Amino acid sequence: MALILASGSPRRRELMSLITPDYTVITSDVDETKIAADSPAHLAKALATAKARAVAEKNPDDVVCGFDTVVECEGEVFGKPKDEADAVRMLRALSGREHRVHTGVCICRGRRAAATVETTVIHFSPIAEDDLCAYVRTPEPYDKAGAYAIQGHAALWCAGIEGCYYNIMGLPVHRTAQLLREFT
């Protein structure tokens, strides 16, 4: 039995290594646009489940961990920005506001699965327009839900966090470790 991380995210690899160094990476080929849900939190959970199950189908004897993160602000859902204009739009929407980061977690082995969602509330200070424009010209915002990396430059905008810090990076370490204990 092997442990598989169903994600190519470098941040998730780093965080999974806090739980265990013994895992392999196999990414899923799930078309995220075909999955819908009734809330942002349920969407994150549904996407994580789809990713974990897709990899588990091909690796039924292994434990597979799938994740997905979405950002929610005033009812709008933000995934990864498509381009610079999209990143600017997202960051302007988050500037000076409270938002939520939902990360779905799904652990599978064969037909057995356990899934949950972790939610963290983030309070952003207002982002100066020149800072925002300079930020979107860096590579940092483009592979992250909500167009920011809390562990990077965006830490300067973060006035407060309620909940799991690692959840904002895409892998709630404590919750994931708890779920994994049920499978190992």
Positions of the model-derived regions?
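Short linear Ser/Thr-Pro motifs
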Residues: 7-9, 28, 95
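N-terminal beta1-alpha1 ligand-phosphate binding loop
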Residues: 1-21
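A short beta-strand-loop structural module common to alpha/beta enzyme folds
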Residues: 24-33
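Short, solvent-exposed secondary-structure junction/capping segments
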Residues: 23-24, 69
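Residue-level detector of short coil/turn "hinge" positions at structural boundaries
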Residues: 22-23, 142
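Anionic-ligand binding patches
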Residues: 3-4, 38-184
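Short loop/helix-cap segments at secondary-structure boundaries that form the rim of catalytic
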Residues: 14-18, 35-36, 57-58
